[in-house]
């Protein structure tokens, strides 16, 4: 028999295609490379809009790294990342908790100069070294520089 059409086609509401087409599941955004002992976090295009989003990030990173039983270095891609302003403090607090528990050194990158500045300032306020770069190669090199 033929496949049924998506019922959203007939509804008088947005279809939610943005979510279906653009959202990458959090678990697919996280990858540990055992050979290099580096954890890669791909937040490209990620939108943090609720406290639940922050909790989901914390839980996913902890689930990926806790089994290692030690801290690792990390590289985080923040290209096209967005966060609602009222959640920045909670987000940075979550980042600090993850760093304390799971990371030696973290480098971050985004081509967005405003985001580098904004998140960088918030991280530095909490005595978290920002290590924010404009490109992936600079961030990778930042791991190798003491």
Predicted features and spans:
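Amphipathic, Lys/Arg-enriched alpha-helical "gate/interface" segment within cytosolic domains
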Residues: 1-146
């Amino acid at each position: 028999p033929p496949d049924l059409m998506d019922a959203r086609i007939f509804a008088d509401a947005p279809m939610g295609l943005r979510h279906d087409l653009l959202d990458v599941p959090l678990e697919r955004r996280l990858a540990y490379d055992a050979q290099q002992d580096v954890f890669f976090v791909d937040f490209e295009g990620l939108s943090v809009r609720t406290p639940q989003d922050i909790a989901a990030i914390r839980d996913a990173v902890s689930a990926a790294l806790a089994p290692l039983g030690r801290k690792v270095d990390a590289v985080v891609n923040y290209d096209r990342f967005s966060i609602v302003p009222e959640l920045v403090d909670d987000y940075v607090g979550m980042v600090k908790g993850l760093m304390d528990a799971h990371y030696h050194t973290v480098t971050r990158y985004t081509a967005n100069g405003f985001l580098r500045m904004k998140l960088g300032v918030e991280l530095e306020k909490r005595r978290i070294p920002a290590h924010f770069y404009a490109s992936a190669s600079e961030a990778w090199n930042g791991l190798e520089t003491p």
